[in-house]
Regions:
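Typically the conserved alpha-helix immediately C-terminal to a functionally engaged Cys/Sec
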Residues: 34-48
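Structural microenvironment flanking redox-active thiols in thiol-disulfide oxidoreductases
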Residues: 61-68
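N-terminal "domain-start" segment that seeds a small globular fold
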Residues: 1-15
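Hydrophobic beta-strand anchors of alpha/beta hydrolase catalytic cores
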Residues: 24-25, 56, 79
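Non-catalytic, surface beta->alpha helical segment in thiol-disulfide oxidoreductase systems
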Residues: 75, 80-117
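N-terminal targeting signals for export/organelle localization
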Residues: 1-2, 48, 110-120
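The canonical Cys-X-X-Cys-His
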Residues: 32-35, 79
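Short active-site neighborhood of thiol/selenol oxidoreductases, capturing the structured segment around
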Residues: 18-30
């Protein structure tokens, strides 16, 4: 199983310039209970998408305030899906079910039927 990527103020820009993948980013705080639960979900998402063009990443907002500011993080956990075009496709605040995170990523991948694309 691959390791979840740790993005930071210093490596974010160069990483995003180089990647051509969809990126799921979890903005978290080490003292946030729901954030700790979501961090355990990241390994599940990593395994689920290991054969897809998706990178699972996390950002500690305490250690990386510039990156948190760039994404206008006001509450954690914040989950963001960045498309291959480098644009934010979806952002959700709070702890969601693992199925909801999968739907967020699948939508960015173009998966799902007509109704999933409309209402997903």
């Amino acid at each position: 199983m691959s390791v979840v990527l740790e993005l930071s103020d210093t490596n974010y820009s160069s990483f995003m310039e180089q990647t051509e993948s969809i990126v799921f980013i979890d903005f978290y705080s080490p003292t946030c209970g729901p954030c700790q639960t979501l961090l355990t979900f990241l390994s599940i998402l990593q395994e689920h998408y290991q054969d897809e063009d998706v990178i699972i990443a996390k950002v500690n907002v305490v250690k990386n305030p510039k990156l948190a500011q760039k994404f206008m993080v006001q509450s954690v956990p914040l989950s963001v899906v960045v498309g291959k075009d480098k644009m934010v496709k979806r952002a959700e605040v709070g702890l969601l079910s693992i199925d909801r995170y999968i739907k967020m990523i699948d939508k960015a991948l173009g998966k799902g039927g007509f109704f999933a694309k409309l209402f997903g």
